[in-house]
């Protein structure tokens, strides 16, 4: 069934595309529009634009974009109906589930969506088992003793998997789900001898793991009785891939954008406690190193990343390794060094929330400053290490994109080598590494001097090298996009088959369909009438094409005449063929060509 158009319009009107896109892309204002790195493909310079006035977005690289619905479809790989429902939930507009082809029999087309639905349904039962059953009391007490309030447990969706081999299995089976699919989703395990299925998580506190869109895609089950392993995580599945997921990103995205900084912690428990303490831009990996996929996504939100790992040797080693890699990828890297032997949870437990947030705010160092402070003893007592680390730190500072931050780092690092900031700066110039010093730097965006490379002017490929007739077609369509009256006055004046540019021909047809249902042209509404990225790009490019506000006298008529020249050329060709048929005396051909000429002339009248 079709969704009522009034519902679609209400959702679209209540959803601001700038706010929506900003949750996924770090945008900078450029003139009247906003620009950022495209979320749909990897690129070195920004080519993804958002128009707040027109409520559309468009990538001039991969051609993807559109209005709020099409952006949501692309970013989440879902259908139009699902996008409408999701955005409706976002702005509190009810969408009739039955009328939009959703049903309660879990007959969802995508296996991935079924896997997500399984996780979200079982979460409700895990939560119930934790908070409402006798079996969950011990686990609940364990959490409460560690500072988890009832409100926090509910907010995070924390639950309890009973000590039963078929709690999850039986629940999903009763709901009509494919047990094999539940196994592939990581909720069940399988006995490889008899191929029987049983619950993967038993007698554990269950922490839901969500993707960037806030959908549950996995679990981390924590023991509260001392059993091993301490944490049992979901296995790699089609919906749960650790290299692509950052814990808490769905909640932290807005704060990351607002603060222009992301804080990376070691584990999700640290994230929960830090978030509760007031640090809202925190995320963590799922027990893995920061991957290239993680970095690519982070760069689209911010270029500033702060590392706050545990205050032990392993945490220090991880900070040095991760920070070095991030610096090489063009990010501004900072470090918060926790007291020895402490993690964020322990710091908060000992000193309180206010002390923790103050510590985070006031004890932040550049990566270069942190690195040299860790290596200071070796630098002071080993001349070979002195030379080695002098070159390393010089290069690290040279990678910093801000000249102000570079100068601050020079001032902080120079005393550790007993040199002046000026001498260290000279060392940087002397040992300046070539652009390909780090061959794995795939992100680009900066020249060999650390300067930001401005994006090249955006060109509209389909508007390059247009013929005289195509230019007339473009201007004609632009005027038709101005208002419905103009369209109605001139629609019958042109035969669509006379368009030489096929994209323009399709736009002409789209305008007909659009004005059949709308009285006023709006690009955000119009893009809903096209299905291909190429045609969508043409429509958006026409919208951005500048033409005089009001047509001069007979201007549109002139464009019509030029477009119809194609039809005139056809008549001239028919006249030529008629003369040739007359010359050779073929009466039948003469009659045929004469009929064609008469028909063509009638079309023009």
From Swiss-Prot:
Cofactor(s) of this protein: Zn(2+); Mg(2+)
Biological function: RNA polymerase that catalyzes the synthesis of short RNA molecules used as primers for DNA polymerase during DNA replication.
SMART domains: TOPRIM, ZnF_CHCC
Ribonucleoprotein keyword on record: no
Protein name: DNA primase
A Pfam family: DNAG_N
Gene Ontology MF terms: ATP binding; DNA binding; DNA helicase activity; DNA-directed RNA polymerase activity; zinc ion binding
Keyword Glycoprotein: no
Family: Belongs to the DnaG primase family.
Source organism, top-level taxon: Bacteria
Zinc finger (CHC2-type): 38-62
Organism encoding this protein: Staphylococcus aureus (strain MW2)
Domain notes: Contains an N-terminal zinc-binding domain, a central core domain that contains the primase activity, and a C-terminal DnaB-binding domain.
Enzyme Commission number, as recorded: 2.7.7.101
Cofactor note: Binds 1 zinc ion per monomer. Binds two Mg(2+) per subunit.
Catalysed reactions, semicolon-separated: ssDNA + n NTP = ssDNA/pppN(pN)n-1 hybrid + (n-1) diphosphate
Complex formation: Monomer. Interacts with DnaB.
Keywords: DNA replication, DNA-binding, DNA-directed RNA polymerase, Magnesium, Metal-binding, Nucleotidyltransferase, Primosome, Transcription, Transferase, Zinc, Zinc-finger
Domain Toprim stretches: 260-341
GO-annotated biological processes: DNA replication, synthesis of primer
A cellular-component GO term for this protein: DNA-directed RNA polymerase complex
Positions with a binding annotation for Mg(2+) 2: 310, 312
Signal peptide boundaries: none
């Amino acid at each position: 069934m079709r969704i009522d158009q009034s519902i679609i319009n209400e959702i679209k009107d209540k959803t601001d595309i700038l706010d929506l896109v900003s949750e996924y892309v770090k945008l900078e204002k450029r003139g009247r529009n906003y620009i950022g790195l495209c979320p749909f493909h990897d690129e070195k310079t920004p080519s993804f634009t958002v128009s707040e006035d027109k409520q559309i977005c468009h990538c001039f690289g991969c051609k993807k974009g559109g209005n709020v619905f099409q952006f949501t479809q692309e970013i989440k790989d879902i259908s139009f109906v699902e996008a409408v429902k999701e955005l409706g939930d976002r702005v509190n507009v009810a969408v009739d589930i039955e009328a939009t082809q959703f049903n309660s029999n879990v007959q969802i087309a995508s296996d991935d969506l079924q896997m997500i639905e399984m996780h979200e349904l079982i979460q409700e039962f895990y939560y119930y088992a934790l908070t409402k059953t006798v079996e969950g009391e011990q686990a609940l007490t364990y959490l409460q003793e560690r500072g988890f309030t009832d409100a926090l447990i509910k907010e995070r969706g924390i639950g309890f998997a009973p000590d039963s081999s078929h709690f999850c299995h039986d629940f999903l089976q009763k709901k009509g789900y494919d047990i094999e699919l539940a196994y592939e989703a990581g909720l069940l395990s399988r006995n490889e001898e008899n191929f029987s299925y049983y619950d993967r998580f038993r007698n554990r506190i269950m922490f839901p793991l969500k993707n960037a869109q806030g959908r549950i895609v996995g679990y981390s089950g924590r023991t509260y009785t001392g059993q091993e392993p301490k944490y049992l995580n979901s296995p790699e599945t089609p919906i749960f891939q650790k290299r692509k997921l950052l814990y808490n990103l769905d909640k932290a995205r807005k704060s990351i954008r607002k603060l222009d900084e992301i804080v990376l912690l070691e584990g999700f428990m640290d994230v929960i406690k830090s978030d509760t303490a007031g640090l809202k831009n925190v995320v963590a990996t799922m027990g893995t190193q920061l991957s290239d996929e993680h970095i690519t996504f982070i760069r689209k939100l911010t270029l500033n990343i702060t590392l706050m790992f545990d205050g032990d040797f392993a945490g220090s080693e991880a900070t040095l390794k991760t920070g070095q890699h991030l610096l090489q990828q063009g990010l501004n890297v900072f470090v918060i060094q926790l007291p020895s032997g402490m993690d964020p949870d322990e710091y908060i437990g000992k000193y309180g929330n206010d002390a923790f947030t103050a510590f985070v705010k006031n004890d932040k160092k550049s990566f270069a400053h942190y690195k040299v402070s860790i290596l200071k003893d070796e630098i002071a007592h080993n001349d070979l290490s002195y030379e080695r680390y002098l070159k390393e730190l010089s290069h690290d500072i040279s990678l910093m994109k801000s000249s102000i931050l570079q100068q601050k780092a020079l001032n902080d690092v120079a005393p550790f080598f007993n040199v002046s900031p000026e001498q260290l700066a000279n060392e940087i110039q002397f040992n300046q590494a070539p652009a390909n010093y780090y061959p794995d730097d795939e992100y680009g965006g900066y020249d060999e001097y650390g300067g930001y490379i401005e994006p090249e002017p955006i060109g509209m490929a389909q508007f390059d090298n247009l013929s005289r007739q195509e230019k007339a077609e473009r201007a004609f369509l632009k005027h038709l996009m101005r208002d419905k009256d103009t369209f109605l006055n001139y629609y019958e004046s042109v035969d669509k088959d006379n368009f030489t540019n096929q994209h323009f021909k399709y736009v002409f047809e789209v305008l007909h369909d659009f004005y059949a249902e709308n009285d006023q042209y709006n690009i955000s509404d119009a893009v809903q009438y096209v299905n291909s990225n190429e045609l969508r790009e043409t429509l958006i490019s026409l919208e951005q094409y500048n033409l005089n506000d009001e047509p001069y006298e007979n201007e549109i008529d002139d464009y019509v005449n030029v477009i119809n020249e194609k039809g005139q050329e056809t008549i001239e060709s028919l006249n030529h063929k008629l003369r040739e048929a007359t010359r050779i005396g073929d009466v039948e051909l003469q009659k045929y060509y004469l009929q064609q000429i008469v028909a063509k002339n009638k079309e023009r009248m």
